[in-house]
Amino acid sequence: MRYIGINVNTGKDVEGRLLKKIVEAIEDNCKDVEVKIYKDSIGLEKKETENLEVVIVLGGDGTILKASKYLAKYNVPILGINIGNLGFLTETESSNFIFSIRNYFKGKYYIEERNMVQCTTEYKGIKKEFHGLNDIVVTKGDVGKTAKYDLYIDGNFYTKLSSDGVIVSTSTGSTAYSLSAGGPIIYPTLDALCLTPICGHSLRIRSIVLNHKSIIKIISQSENVILTVDGEEINFLENVKEFLITSSPYKCKLIKLEGEHRDYYSILRNKLYL
């Protein structure tokens, strides 16, 4: 018996028509199969997820980002089928799903691993860990006030920063918030972390690309800080000042189909209007 998961963004496949067609395509290509359906990533956090050989994600990059933090933990690969705008992470378009499902079951694919980022902090005496595929963002909680941060890299003092916040992105996340804040584009499979200030008050402070083994410590001088992981606000953290950011021990595994893999540079050109 093969166990296949489907995670659908119900805001994009509102009536479930694509979901139904994909279930039918799976059953047409594999007779001894059980399909588990998840809506908006609910349930992916459960331990039974580790029994799935793959999760087909119906949605966009945001849907994959949300699912990845659960699936990476259980070492389950993702096959992304895009609904809506062109994305960096989805592998194929919804109009081509029959070909994609057929190729998967024929074994015509390979798995591309993407580094993830981890943030460790302590909140109310409890150690907390968060994992993201794109980025970890530390921003000020007090609107209108200047925030100051002390930045350390591998135990060495790097700089004292006055800014609206700090982004630590993976190579995958370099084309997201980090790019908007002036960071560089990094090829997504490179093992790297990128530290980018948000609206730094000095033009001398720029992004820095680091080895993926680097340990970044952010110490906030503000009492109220907002921690955001892959665009999802974790909490309004009162009296939390220290954040330790490293590469995550988990990897996001993306399925790339033979004969269908999209050229990264064409996606980059279309997304960024180059």
Swiss-Prot record:
Q: Name one Pfam family in it.
A: NAD_kinase_C
Say which domain of life the source belongs to: Bacteria
Keywords for this protein: ATP-binding, Cytoplasm, Kinase, NAD, NADP, Nucleotide-binding, Transferase
Gene Ontology terms for molecular function: ATP binding; metal ion binding; NAD binding; NAD+ kinase activity
Predominant cellular place of this UniProt entry's protein: cytoplasm
Localisation per UniProt entry: Cytoplasm
Output the Gene Ontology cellular-component terms. Answer: cytoplasm
Q: Which InterPro entries match?
A: ATP-NAD_kinase_N, ATP-NAD_kinase_PpnK-typ_C, NAD/diacylglycerol_kinase_sf, NADK
Residue spans making up a coiled coil are none
Native source species: Clostridium tetani (strain Massachusetts / E88)
EC number(s) per entry: 2.7.1.23
Kindly list the cofactors needed: a divalent metal cation
What enzyme class is recorded for this protein? transferase
Q: What is this protein called?
A: NAD kinase
Q: Which residues form the active site?
A: 61 (proton acceptor)
Q: What does this protein do?
A: Involved in the regulation of the intracellular balance of NAD and NADP, and is a key enzyme in the biosynthesis of NADP. Catalyzes specifically the phosphorylation on 2'-hydroxyl of the adenosine moiety of NAD to yield NADP.
Name any Gene Ontology BP term: NAD metabolic process
Entry binding sites for NAD(+): 61-62, 66, 134-135, 145, 164, 175-180
Which family does the record claim for this protein? Belongs to the NAD kinase family.
